[in-house]
Amino acid sequence: MATRRMRQGAQVASDEAEETQLTKLGQDLSKTFLNKDFADIQVKCGKKTFDCHRVILAARSCVLKTMLSSDGSEQREMEIEIVDFDAEVIFQMLQFIYTGKLDDPFYDAEDIDMATELLRAADKYELDSMKALCEKKLASFLYVENCLRVLILADSYQAFELKKDALEVINRNRKVVFKSEDWEKCVKNHPKLAVEITNMIE
């Protein structure tokens, strides 16, 4: 018994030490965010330019890794230009790449715009853990009034957990949902999804 307790205690101590080291590693890595020291690539978005590190971008996103490959024009020009997102969205995405966290404005936001854009960015750049955070945030905004719009968003970007949550809201409030203008638009513009919804209800 004593030997077993000693082994268990040693394992706990080892796990705690490993967790401490991982926390320290994350803190050290976060210090490089927007730090020009050793930066070797610039990410441009609108009027904003972010100094970044190729190895970190490539390690965190296989899409960015492809963009930074030796065959790409970005390699020669030493920059990536992003034109399909606002600078604030790219700032938040880069912060997540470096720190694994999103900024307070994301968590404090009272509308779904930023979470929607970050979900879109996470899907495009294949940042699965960021995508999961965005799904969770968007799920907190789910109401009868917007459940169909959120469902369409989730379906478009393969946000499966968010889609499941939206379907549950629709199912619980189907009488109201099926009489809404959003439902008419869904049937017209997203017929396959409308069939999926009705099959689920039946």
Predicted segments — roles?
Residues S14, E18, I82-V83, D123, ...:
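Generic alpha-helical structural element
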Residues A17, Q21, L25, S30, ...:
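Short, functionally important structural connectors and interaction interfaces within domains
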Residues M1-L29, D37-A39, K185, N189, ...:
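Eukaryotic cytosolic interaction/assembly regions at protein N-termini and domain boundaries
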Residues A10-Q11, R60, T66, V169:
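A periodicity- and composition-biased signal for non-globular, repetitive helical segments
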Residues K31-V144:
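Canonical BTB/POZ domain core
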Residues L22, D86-I90, K163:
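A structural signal for well-ordered alpha-helical scaffolds and beta->alpha junctions
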Residues E79, D103-R120, L133-E202:
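BTB/POZ-protein C-terminal extensions
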